[in-house]
Design a protein with these regions (language model features):
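Acetyl-CoA-dependent GNAT
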Residues: 2-74, 78, 85-87, 91-95, ...
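Conserved catalytic-core motifs of GNAT/GCN5-like acyltransferases
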Residues: 103, 121-137
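Short glycine/proline-centered loop/turn elements that form peptide/ligand docking sites
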Residues: 85, 108-111, 128-133
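Terminal substrate-recognition subdomain of acyl/acetyltransferases
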Residues: 136-144
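Conserved active-site tyrosine of GNAT-family acetyltransferases
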Residues: 115, 120, 140
Length: 144
């Protein structure tokens, strides 16, 4: 597996993965627009030309927010999400970011365990943040 910065050739596969993994997915056009966003950093995990996972963030001015992370269902439980989060943290730190914040569904125990293992701590809660189904988001933060 290789972790690369998102390029135009990856956008269609990332959009397909977004539709597969989320009830309220980003459009292909929205993902493509991130290529020209100087505040954005998106990474993809690629195996044999196939995007098996991705992660996206935005930074303003030295604080970063994780926008999305997803791994194809056929490739889960192999450490891909952890590798993507770790690579993102490293890249953001090199770019001068001092922290990374994210939201996670309060019921997403596997993700919460992974983020805790990677050094994220609870920073707050957003009631009814998610739709389909309606659910609170936990705000997690890691100092880089």
């Amino acid at each position: 597996m290789k972790i690369l910065e998102l390029r135009g050739e990856h956008v269609t596969q990332v959009a397909a993965l977004e539709r597969l993994c989320f009830a309220d997915p980003w459009s292909e056009k929205s993902i493509a627009s991130e290529l020209n966003n100087p505040l954005a950093l998106w990474l993809v995990a690629v195996e044999e030309e196939e995007v098996v996972g991705y992660i996206g963030s935005q930074t303003v001015p030295d604080e970063s927010d994780m926008m999305n992370v997803a791994v194809h269902p056929d490739h889960r439980r192999r450490g891909i999400a952890q590798a993507l989060v770790t690579a993102l943290c490293d890249a953001l730190k090199k770019r001068g970011s001092v922290s990374l914040t994210l939201e996670v569904r309060s019921s997403n125990e596997p993700a919460k365990a992974m983020y805790e293992k990677l050094g994220f701590g609870l920073a707050g809660r957003r009631p009814n943040y998610y739709r389909n189904p309606k659910e609170d988001a936990l705000i997690l933060r890691k100092m880089l």
